[in-house]
């Protein structure tokens, strides 16, 4: 469905690396995807005003809501950082918030540290259907610290299901981290920048 974006993303990443040696992340990824969406005919409402809605970084002309994320590929999985959930006090509040999907798809521009440590600029454009991440329907367990200052204290929550696992880390502003099996993703495109 989104494979037509790949040549345009590749072109934008090449331009990014003509200017920068570091990876394309955050607002750079948002802007580069915006241009790719427009060039591929999807359109985008993204603007460089840091004023997008919660969970949605840009919306196409046909109303597809996209959350841009970075990620790390490890073996057959991708690890994606998500929302900070501090303002939602209980685990039930956090899961209720997560159940109200603001985005339709997560467009993840992931890297594998092994590629980059060898000097290879390889990205993975990964599309995840947000509906498949049904956090609120999973069995969450408390994580209790085992040593140091967090010993015997609540350090967060986690869930494990067939196609993904997730954790909420109190030490990181209750940030959500999701590890998704690559074969559960809608699309995966390798992009090598030379």
Question: Where do the model's predicted regions map?
Answer:
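Nucleic-acid endonuclease domains
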Residues: 1-64, 68-194
